[in-house]
Amino acid sequence: MKKEIASHLLEIGAVFLQPNDPFTWSSGMKSPIYCDNRLTLSYPKVRQAIAAGLEELIKEHFPTVEVIAGTATAGIAHAAWVSDRMNLPMCYVRSKAKGHGKGNQIEGKAEKGQKVVVVEDLISTGGSAITCVEALREAGCEVLGIVSIFTYELEAGKEKLAAANVASYSLSDYSTLTQVAEEKGMIGQAEMKKLQEWRKNPADEAWITA
């Protein structure tokens, strides 16, 4: 599963690896990887594989789920496809409440006491997913956990999720994707070394000259 999803993401260009020409994230951090899972929406076979995989993760880890919640905006489409496959209610959660109308942060129904699983496209530092979890908890829901398409496996993200006391499972991850990229000849040994060094300590830019 992890290798299959990693291959899909690389093949459609949803994930770029540029260890010799780093990306700059909005936080200002230099990174050898950039992930745009929104591209998966344009590839029916890929998005179907993702929906099936997310359904499998949910059934395995959170079998008592009653509602599927997507993170706005990237998680919404995947949450919709998964909820349709599982014949479950769906909602989505904004990063903050609307400034007009009813001022909703949660769109759709997620009622007090209901068991909810959050669908996210990407786990980086875990911030957006945790915002979603907190909003659902404030509404009285029992959040069983998070499922996502991909995770960078950053320690900062793992620590935040642990602090929020929420379980998280991803279809694929950084370690698997870089391995698949090397197997496909997309990166060489020197580039792999840089990718591995970044993974150990993303804040330390020494990996750029590794």
Swiss-Prot record:
The protein's name in its UniProt record: Orotate phosphoribosyltransferase
Cofactor(s) listed: Mg(2+)
Broad enzyme group: transferase
Pfam families: Pribosyltran
Lineage: Bacteria, Bacillati, Bacillota, Bacilli, Bacillales
Matching HAMAP family: PyrE
GO molecular function annotation: magnesium ion binding; orotate phosphoribosyltransferase activity
Positions that bind 5-phospho-alpha-D-ribose 1-diphosphate: R94, K98, H100, E120, D121, L122, I123, S124, T125, G126, G127, S128
Catalyzed reactions: orotidine 5'-phosphate + diphosphate = orotate + 5-phospho-alpha-D-ribose 1-diphosphate
Biological processes annotated in GO: 'de novo' UMP biosynthetic process; pyrimidine nucleobase biosynthetic process
Pathway: Pyrimidine metabolism; UMP biosynthesis via de novo pathway; UMP from orotate: step 1/2
Gene3D superfamilies named among the record's database cross-references: 3.40.50.2020
Source domain of life: Bacteria
Positions with a binding annotation for orotate: S124
Protein family: Belongs to the purine/pyrimidine phosphoribosyltransferase family. PyrE subfamily.
Entry function: Catalyzes the transfer of a ribosyl phosphate group from 5-phosphoribose 1-diphosphate to orotate, leading to the formation of orotidine monophosphate (OMP).
